[in-house]
Regions:
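Charged, often glycine-rich, active-site loop that binds/positions anionic groups
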Residues: 57-85, 253-254
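Flexible, glycine-rich phosphate/dinucleotide-binding loops
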Residues: 6, 60, 212
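Alpha-helical cap/lid subdomain in secreted, periplasmic
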Residues: 77-271
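Serine-esterase "nucleophile elbow" of acetyl-processing enzymes
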Residues: 1-57, 99
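Acidic/His-rich segments in extracytoplasmic proteins that coordinate ligands and/or metal ions
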Residues: 53-54, 66-68, 72, 91-96, ...
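Short, solvent-exposed loop/turn and secondary-structure capping segments
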Residues: 8-13, 64-66, 110-115
Length: 271
């Protein structure tokens, strides 16, 4: 998975600073006791040597495909800053009895937020935080007002306003369409790659939570992805786990309750 799986936002997530980016090896077995990997492992009676967290922050679906096929990314993902090389990655997959896949959110979220930064000349930090906070999850006019107020506080130039409006009302559709193409091309290959390494493992495919249902482009993106993932699971004999109401924090990652919810959904699906 990506940062959702790794436990970004939880207090005791483990990592080291690497020459390029971050080294997540300490988190493979030293992950937060509050993340869903820990909770699922506990529910299945597994210790940390038998419940491994391969969540890698910033990962997009083509990056995961590289990791599954080569245990390495050939180059840094410039949009997300992710770059990982772990020779042991494939070996973990070969030895597993159950493998969960959580990937695809960053394929849209990262380029959308980068696009917003570029459109506003990086005046958009507060708006971006609001967009991914989960505060806009349930639409009402008060929350629409918060969104518009954050827009107004940015004090944009004419060109910045025009670029921002284009992104919000047209550009995000283009980004999400491309992201959907990327995920739907990569995900079946990820499943095939895992099966080539370990044909006997149960594969659990997690669905998606939309942190910003107020944005129509993201609504469509995550709705389409959930339908695709569910259909893929049916076609490939995977265990599909729906997580539509995972609670997210200010950075868009699951809260402690969000991880508990995801873990419960997985454990129920494995019964």
């Amino acid at each position: 998975g990506d940062s959702i799986t790794s436990g970004v936002g939880l207090a005791d997530m483990k990592y080291n600073i690497a020459q390029i980016g971050y080294d997540l090896r300490p988190n493979f077995e030293g992950y937060s006791s509050q993340c869903y990997t820990a909770l699922v492992g506990k529910g299945l009676g597994l210790d940390r040597q038998h419940a491994i967290n391969l969540g890698l922050p910033g990962l997009m679906s083509p990056d995961m495909l590289d990791m599954v096929q080569n245990s390495a990314m050939p180059k840094m993902n410039q949009a997300s800053g992710a770059y990982y090389v772990y020779p042991e990655y494939q070996e973990y997959l070969r030895k597993a009895d159950i493998i969960s896949i959580q990937i695809g959110s960053n394929d849209a979220l990262v380029p959308c937020i980068v696009g917003l930064g570029e459109a506003t000349n990086w005046k958009s930090e507060q708006l971006a935080a609001l967009m991914v906070s989960g505060a806009l999850r349930d639409f009402n006019f008060q929350k629409l007002g918060l969104f518009l107020e954050a827009l107004n506080r940015m004090t944009l130039t004419f060109d910045e306003s025009r670029a921002t409006n284009r992104l919000l009302f047209r550009g995000m559709d283009e980004i999400c369409d491309q992201a959907y193409t990327n995920v739907t091309a990569s995900l079946p290959q990820i499943v095939a790659g895992i099966r080539a390494l370990n044909p006997d493992a149960k594969i659990v495919l997690l669905g998606y939570t939309n942190p910003v249902p107020l944005l129509p482009a993201w609504n469509r993106y995550f709705s389409k992805l959930n339908r695709f993932a569910k259909d893929l699971a049916t076609q490939e004999g995977l265990i599909y786990v729906d997580i539509p109401r995972a609670q997210t924090a200010a950075d868009g990652h699951p809260t402690v309750k969000g991880h508990q919810y995801i873990a419960n959904q997985i454990l129920n699906a494995l019964k």
